[in-house]
């Protein structure tokens, strides 16, 4: 083997002797997440039915009372307000993402319904919905739709790393 460091044999021997008792360190600083379990294939008919069922909850006529002061936020009655604070601080990291850019209101409602159904099916507690800025149609409607769904515990404007004012972090109620 050619010596690429231009060391003499004595220097190499000295180095090997100095590290003779060294042991490889075990990596303990990064927590590795296990990949999500891939379940059974879900029939397309069931997925479509879940979308239709979930979009049933979204009405354009009903206007829930949302606080207009400050960032967009909501907490379902009976849910601890500390959950909204944890969303605001970024304590929850979303495991599912939905980008509504370029969708019509009807498509956006269906996709929101599908996202909530997928969160329940996959046992995902926090999701990120990116509505964008655009003409503010979806930005205004998305919180109103989410506040109507019975499986949404809370939502808050996302921290900058998850989209800032163009996104919402949503907490979904999971069955125990």
Curated annotation (Swiss-Prot):
InterPro entries (alphabetical): Smr_dom, Smr_dom_sf, SmrB-like
Source taxon at top rank: Bacteria
Keyword hit for Membrane: no
Annotated EC: 3.1.-.-
Keyword annotations from UniProtKB, A to Z: Endonuclease, Hydrolase, Nuclease, RNA-binding, rRNA-binding
One GO-annotated biological process of the protein: rescue of stalled ribosome
SMART domains: SMR
One Pfam family per UniProt: Smr
Bridged cysteine pairs (disulfide): none
Family: Belongs to the SmrB family.
Subunit details: Associates with collided ribosomes, but not with correctly translating polysomes.
Role according to the record: Acts as a ribosome collision sensor. Detects stalled/collided disomes (pairs of ribosomes where the leading ribosome is stalled and a second ribosome has collided with it) and endonucleolytically cleaves mRNA at the 5' boundary of the stalled ribosome. Stalled/collided disomes form a new interface (primarily via the 30S subunits) that binds SmrB. Cleaved mRNA becomes available for tmRNA ligation, leading to ribosomal subunit dissociation and rescue of stalled ribosomes.
Protein name from the UniProt record: Ribosome rescue factor SmrB
Gene encoding the protein: smrB
């Amino acid at each position: 083997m050619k010596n690429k460091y231009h060391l003499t044999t004595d220097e190499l021997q000295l180095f090997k002797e100095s590290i003779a008792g060294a042991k490889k360190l075990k990596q303990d600083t990064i927590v590795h997440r296990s990949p999500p379990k891939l379940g059974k294939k879900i029939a397309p008919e069931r997925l479509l039915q879940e979308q239709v069922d979930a979009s049933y909850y979204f009405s354009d006529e009903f206007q829930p009372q949302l606080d207009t002061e400050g960032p967009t936020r909501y907490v379902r009655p009976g849910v601890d307000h500390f959950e909204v604070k944890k969303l605001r601080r970024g304590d929850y990291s979303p495991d599912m993402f939905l980008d509504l850019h370029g969708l019509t209101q009807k498509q956006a409602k269906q996709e929101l319904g599908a996202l909530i159904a997928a969160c329940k099916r996959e046992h995902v507690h926090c999701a990120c919905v990116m509505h964008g800025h655009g003409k503010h149609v979806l930005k205004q409607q998305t919180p109103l739709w989410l506040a109507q769904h019975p499986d949404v515990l809370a939502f808050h404007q996302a921290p900058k790393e998850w989209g800032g004012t163009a996104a919402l972090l949503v907490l979904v109620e999971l069955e125990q």
